[in-house]
Amino acid sequence: MPTVSEAWQNASKLIDRFEAKLLLASCLGVTRTYLITHDKDALTESVLNHYKKCVQERAKGVPVPYILGKQEFYGRPFKVTPAVLIPRPDTETIVEFVLAQCPIDSELSVLDMGTGSGCIAITLALENSNLNVNATDVSPAALEIAETNAKNLGADIHFYCGSWFEAIPDSLRYDIIVSNPPYIHREDEHLKNLGYEPIGALTDGFDGLTHIDHIIKNAPSFLKKNGLLAFEHGWDQGESVRTLFKKHSLWKDIQTIQDLGGNDRVTAARLA
């Protein structure tokens, strides 16, 4: 049997060196530091076979988080499967923005629309225990993952299944509505690199603004006065989203927030 060092070095001929180590550490159930301190240890046959399978999947293009079954977001491990998008660091921008709008001692109601893995809703609930968080998704499979993550991480969230506001009882009103909707343009060249993720969570099949426009149009019926509506969007969509808010005329305090890379990432407004 090959040693720890030999195994990841052989794998790095097929996949990225860092990913080769990450996958091996996962197969062994250890940290990457362990790979250094135990580099001469021989692998068992079962671990080697499992590792080879993981490497083969990665070599075919399967994203590492889907192979591992998890992805870290805001310092917490979230279960992921191909039923949900892989949480990305850029999405922490909208979480931080919303948290900044919520005084720690204020009890506010929050709705996360299109929750996917639940990373936004769960993080908001855990970072501010005074928030009453609801979340929706049109996909039952995605909601199952989100509910599992909420249970595993200890977040108290009520989930609704359905398409956007159709999922929400008409009687509910929120202080904040947040969404990371499918916003990628159907002709965006990056879509071809995201083939393993659910296409319906990536793009609306048009210009990427269809769902954003729909939510802006219908959100006033589900927001309290002065309520906040915030979207994550593409780096080049800030101006377009601001224009959509202005088109519907019921909004004030329209603003766009940049991510750590200096790109437009979140646009928000308050109900007038």
Sequence positions of predicted segments:
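Non-catalytic accessory regions of SAM-dependent methyltransferases
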Residues: 1-36, 40-43
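Conserved AdoMet
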Residues: 25-100
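Short glycine/proline- and charge-enriched loop/turn segments
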Residues: 33, 75, 191-201
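Active-site beta-alpha loop architecture of Rossmann-like, nucleotide-cofactor-dependent enzymes
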Residues: 65, 184, 236
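Conserved SAM/SAH cofactor-binding pocket of Class I
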Residues: 93-193, 214
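Glycine-rich S-adenosyl-L-methionine
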Residues: 136-142, 195-224, 228, 234-237
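Short alpha-helix
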Residues: 235-247
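Core SAM-dependent methyltransferase catalytic element
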Residues: 246-272
